[in-house]
Amino acid sequence: MIVRVLTATLKADQAGLFNELMRTQLPLLRHHPGLRYVKLARRIRGGEQEVCLFEEWADTASLYGWAGPDLERPRLLPGAEELVIDLRVAHYEALDMDPEPEGG
């Protein structure tokens, strides 16, 4: 499994619009084949907000199917990337593999 973490830093006055765009995108992401988990989280630090999107993918083919050929580029709705001060995407190999459910 692959864990993908998108971290975006926003000015506080842009955070509401960015969060709205991300919440609009989540249903699209949740229905993509191979996605096992997704969580959108934030923390407020002074005049900025940091947003993290945690994704867990069953395999690299599923991740590429969602993200496209350049995994370092985020897949965001139009207008979202222009709202950020800093944007990072990182990928990790999951080490704590969940057992498959019985009968499936």
What do these predicted regions represent?
Residues 2-8:
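Active-site-flanking beta-strand signature of metal-NTP-handling nucleotidyl enzymes
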Residues 9, 41, 54-56:
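Short hydrophobic/aromatic beta-strand micro-patches
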Residues 9-21:
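Short, surface-exposed ligand-recognition loops at beta-strand->loop->(often short) alpha-helix junctions
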Residues 21, 41, 66-69:
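Residue-level signal for well-ordered alpha-helical positions
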Residues 26-52:
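Short, glycine- and small/hydrophobic-rich beta-strand elements in well-ordered beta-sheets
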Residues 28-36, 56-91:
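An amphipathic, aromatic/His-enriched active-site/gating alpha helix that lines ligand/cofactor pockets
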Residues 39-49, 75-104:
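Glycine-rich beta-strand-turn "strand-cap" elements at beta-sheet edges
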